[in-house]
Amino acid sequence: MALPQFPYLSQHEWRYFDDANHDPALAASDSLAYQDSFIRWLPHLQGDQPQGLVHFYSIDRPTVLLGAKDSRLPNLAAGLAYLEEQGFDYALRPHGGLGVVCDPDILNIGLASDLTHFPLSIDAAYEQMVALIGLSLIPYGLELEAYEIAQSYCPGTYDLVVGGQKIGGIAQRRFKTGLTTAAYISVAGDQAARAQLMAGFYQAAGADDSYPQVDPAVMTTLAHACGQPLDRQSYQEELIQLISHYQKLVPGDYQDPDLVPIFNKMRQVSLARTQSLKSEVNSTQDS
């Protein structure tokens, strides 16, 4: 298959980080701390071309990554207690306004770059991720579209849609000249159950009409859409191969002396974000 030009990929030197290989038991809050860290670490990187990072941070423990708007739900403690009853952990993420589900069949990927060397508008940054995921679906005979699926969880203008159903979503974060565009892809598993979980969460938390009215029928998985067995790891390998077509990928070093102190600081920030949620539940139980 002849691939189109992709300047964003071809004009960066990419380092890739895979949290599952680094530490399979890594907490969700630590994966989010790495997201915060990479966007701050980028200015320390030097090379012949602009530097970019590919971050795989899939989370095996059933977890809901909540957004800033979720933290303002009127009965948040009841919603969090509901998630715990369903066997789900939770964390508060630094980007995206609403919650998404993580489990062993969900792939999370982030692309981080420095706007000083490769300027991108907000829309253009989203479009880079749409283009990458779209190219990855061509071998499956699938055409990717990007538009809002209002009755999905975490709906947004750049929802990833196949055959009218959402298979993933994208969020974006900027810090000074750093940019991270992150996507989740529902590769396989029970997407209806994920949607029902989020519908139950919003109901328990007393959400009004400004929050998603989640309908499981509007979402699906990549495996279901292509009609063949597929797992997260194999799809991740396909993404790695696709990016490698445009530019060599070099394994990143989690122990880089410039990265470690940044991560240690951001880890405390991430833990504090999530602890603020857990305090909601504890204070309700104590009252």
Indicate residue ranges for each PLM-predicted region.
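Short amphipathic alpha-helical segments
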Residues: D30, Y34, N75, S121-L132, ...
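Contiguous, small/hydrophobic- and glycine-enriched helical/loop subdomains that border
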Residues: L107-A150
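Local beta-strand/beta-hairpin segments that build beta-sheet-rich folds
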Residues: F17, I167-G168, V218, L222
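Beta-rich nucleic-acid/ligand-interaction surfaces
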Residues: A146-I167
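N-terminal lobe of the biotin/lipoate ligase/transferase fold
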Residues: M1-P119
